[in-house]
Amino acid sequence: MTNTPKTPAETETLLSEVQGWKHRHVLDLDNFSREELDMVMQTAGVMLDILSRPVKKVPALKGKTIATLFYEPSTRTRSSFELAAKSLSADVLNLNVSQSSVSKGESLLDTLDTLEALGADMVVMRHPLSGAPYLAANHCRANIINAGDGWHAHPSQALLDIFTILRHKPALEGLKITLIGDIKHSRVAHSNIWGLSKMGAEITLCAPYTLLPEGLNTDSQIFPEVTVKTDIKQAVSGADVVMGLRLQRERQQSGLLPGIREYAQYFQLNAEILKLAKPDALVMHPGPVNEDIELSQSVVHGEQSVINEQVKNGVAIRMALFYLCSGSKEI
């Protein structure tokens, strides 16, 4: 379980124990150590305490400017990052891409130059092209936080998923975690595989063959302790955590699925399938949920669902990332 401080003194003690952070940018979790993941979890516990106070704000990043640069639509992630920045007293520069010079053909690097000229200390970036945040990180003095790039990565989502699990389970070591859905097009799945495997979880991926990354089959192992199943009953059996993934219809080429109804028939997590998991299994989803496609309504709104908790915890995780990347020692 993650620690949440009870007093200001405990807050200072917990943060003083967070040492050795080396990341200027957060691009994915493949280059994070287990110890660094633990640092994020511990810091997020402090931030969650701040968010539970009557005044949900501290001056840790007062005087800093955080820009949000989203080339794709977003409600949860963008709002979560903005609230996280404001909770740390940072100024937020929200660039509306559709109404900016980007719509006139301005390049990504030119846009980043403009944001830095305006004083941005950090840039939260979502882009449809995999690798775009890496290009930005090599170009900018500002810290870059990847809020999702193409099919590649969504590190803050994976971190909040880990944090949410640890609010309910004592550790991830040995936990059986099943991810069901569009693995091929899911940046959430890719970052979760890295993060969860580093924390010692045993991961099962479940999807139709056409929605698995190319080159995989049921005998493949692409990460330590990761296996692949195309039968949802086998995949869910004995699981401690079951995570549905959104069917990425906007990213798919025609012909990957015979139809949405057929997908739901064979890969929807419903109450009957969920009974195969452990009685205290958690149900998760990065959102937005296509109800009665990936998850049945009864599962989405059932007692085992922690989907809304994931949203709440996302703010704490993003506060932690801002705090750690800024190098701040104040809270």
Swiss-Prot record:
Per UniProt, which keywords does this protein have? Answer: Pyrimidine biosynthesis, Transferase
InterPro entries associated with the record: Asp/Orn_carbamoyltranf_P-bd, Asp/Orn_carbamoylTrfase, Asp/Orn_carbamoylTrfase_sf, Asp_carbamoyltransf, Asp_carbamoyltransf_Asp/Orn-bd
Family recorded in the similarity comment: Belongs to the aspartate/ornithine carbamoyltransferase superfamily. ATCase family.
In short, the EC number is: 2.1.3.2
Cysteine pairs bridged by disulfides in the record: none
Q: What is the lineage of its organism?
A: Bacteria, Bacillati, Chloroflexota, Dehalococcoidia, Dehalococcoidales
Quaternary structure? Heterododecamer (2C3:3R2) of six catalytic PyrB chains organized as two trimers (C3), and six regulatory PyrI chains organized as three dimers (R2).
Q: What organism does this protein naturally occur in?
A: Dehalococcoides mccartyi (strain ATCC BAA-2266 / KCTC 15142 / 195)
Q: Which residues bind carbamoyl phosphate?
A: 76-77, 126, 154, 157, 287-288
| A Pfam family that the UniProt record links to this protein | OTCace_N
* UniProt name for this protein: Aspartate carbamoyltransferase catalytic subunit
Q: Which NCBIfam families has this protein been placed in? A: asp_carb_tr (TIGR00670), PRK00856.1 (NF002032)
Q: Does the keyword Transferase apply?
A: yes
Function, as annotated = Catalyzes the condensation of carbamoyl phosphate and aspartate to form carbamoyl aspartate and inorganic phosphate, the committed step in the de novo pyrimidine nucleotide biosynthesis pathway.
GO molecular function term, any single one: amino acid binding
| Biological-process GO terms, alphabetical | 'de novo' pyrimidine nucleobase biosynthetic process; 'de novo' UMP biosynthetic process; amino acid metabolic process
Q: Which reaction does it catalyse?
A: carbamoyl phosphate + L-aspartate = N-carbamoyl-L-aspartate + phosphate + H(+)
Q: In which pathway does it act?
A: Pyrimidine metabolism; UMP biosynthesis via de novo pathway; (S)-dihydroorotate from bicarbonate: step 2/3
**One cellular component GO annotation, for this chain's record?**
cytosol
According to the lineage, what is the superkingdom? Bacteria
Residue positions binding L-aspartate: 104, 187, 246
HAMAP family to which the protein is assigned, alphabetical: Asp_carb_tr
